[in-house]
């Protein structure tokens, strides 16, 4: 599938709009090479490649409105995206407890241990109401 490209001046300089032959628009980022989003379904069938003219522009809000929530966050966070994607793709058991999403990552129990001078095992024996995660 062939693409035509044009750096849209209304977007930030690190964003590139690509228009496919079928009319769909693809948004790519120069900062995060893995980021792209397809906007609009385009039309079926092929045709000759069509370049975006310098007069043709796409309002950034119309592109933004079509993006998924994850891609919207990429626009907002820009340089912090690498950290966010590492967090999202990391297994749940190794996520930081102070995660960006507040999604209840693994909670470190070290501060919890200090509440029981005799050790956590002894506390479990003495207090049956204490339930430990399995």
Curated annotation (Swiss-Prot):
Instruction: Give the record's family classification.
Output: Belongs to the ycf68 family.
**Primary localization class, coarse:** plastid
* One Pfam family from the record: DUF2647
Q: What is this protein called?
A: Uncharacterized protein ycf68
List the GO cellular component terms.
chloroplast
Q: Which domain of life is it from?
A: Eukaryota
**Keyword terms, alphabetized:** Chloroplast, Plastid
UniProt-annotated location(s): Plastid, Chloroplast
Species: Saccharum officinarum (Sugarcane)
- Known InterPro entries for this protein? Uncharacterised_Ycf68
């Amino acid at each position: 599938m062939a693409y035509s490209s044009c750096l849209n001046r209304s977007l930030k300089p690190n964003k590139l709009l690509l228009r496919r032959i079928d009319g769909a628009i693809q948004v790519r980022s120069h900062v995060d090479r893995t980021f792209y989003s397809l906007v609009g379904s385009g039309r079926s069938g092929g045709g000759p490649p069509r370049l975006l003219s310098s007069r043709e522009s796409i309002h950034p809000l119309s592109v933004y409105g079509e993006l998924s929530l994850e891609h919207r966050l990429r626009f907002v966070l820009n340089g912090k995206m690498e950290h966010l994607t590492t967090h999202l793709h990391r297994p749940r058991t190794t996520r930081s407890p102070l995660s960006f999403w507040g999604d209840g990552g693994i909670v470190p129990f070290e501060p919890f241990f200090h509440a029981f001078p005799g050790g956590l095992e002894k506390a479990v024996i003495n207090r049956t109401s204490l339930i430990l995660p399995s």
